[in-house]
A protein has these predicted regions:
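N-terminal juxtamembrane/topogenic regions of multi-pass membrane proteins
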Residues: 1-5
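N-terminal topogenic membrane-targeting module
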Residues: 6-67
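Zinc-dependent metalloendopeptidases
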Residues: 41-43, 68-70, 144, 168-171
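Active-site recognition of the HExxH zinc-binding catalytic motif
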Residues: 45, 145-162
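Auxiliary, metal-adjacent structural segments of Zn-dependent hydrolase domains
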Residues: 53, 57, 61-131, 139-142
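Conserved binding/catalytic microenvironments
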Residues: 134
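Post-HExxH zinc-binding segment in Zn-dependent metallohydrolases
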Residues: 160-173
Length: 173
């Protein structure tokens, strides 16, 4: 039996998605990372997991991940950052934070020229970027104190997305 995705209310196979020109799927290793490290994904029913995987893969494909003060952004980083965005936008059918073209990843807190400070994350509208400290993103998902950098910064990106005139404009009341 093949893998199926729930898309626009219909259950579609990977083959159907490919014929439609939609080729967003996660590798087994990427799915494993979600299963091991992402509680929201773990709690989803199977059909919703398939849709979540599709949306994570599409988010990764749509963004340029840029390393700062590190050699590269790993696949694990891409998957968990994308999962943060999709967790927040999962109830919206076509919201992928498209205004933010770049995801800039630092290993730890960084100096922000825009804010002249050392934040853990920010959304920089001028650079069209979501900027994150990897260390603090991971801490946000491992602690139970209610502080989650990934969701916090993706919420800023979502707010910006609602303001900018593009295909994802004006979806919030």
């Amino acid at each position: 039996m093949g893998v199926y995705y729930l898309l626009f209310g219909k259950l579609l196979s990977e083959g159907t998605l490919a014929r439609l020109g939609i080729s967003a799927s996660l590798s087994p290793a990427q799915k494993d990372r979600l299963s091991r490290h992402f509680r929201f994904y773990q709690l989803l029913p199977p059909k919703s997991k398939a849709l979540f995987e599709y949306r994570v893969a599409k988010f990764i494909r749509m963004k340029e991940f840029v390393p700062r003060n590190m050699t590269h952004v790993t696949e694990e980083m891409q998957v968990l950052i994308a999962a943060s965005a999709i967790q927040l936008t999962f109830g919206y059918p076509k919201v992928f934070l498209s205004y933010s073209r770049y995801v800039i990843v630092f290993p730890d807190q960084f100096f922000s020229n825009a804010g002249q400070r050392y934040p853990k994350g920010e959304v920089n509208p001028k650079a069209k970027a979501i900027v994150l400290s990897w260390k603090h993103l991971v801490e946000g998902y491992s602690k139970s104190d209610g502080v989650n950098l990934g969701l916090h910064e993706m919420a800023h990106a979502l707010q910006l997305e609602n303001i900018v005139m593009n295909d994802e404009y004006d979806f919030l009341d």
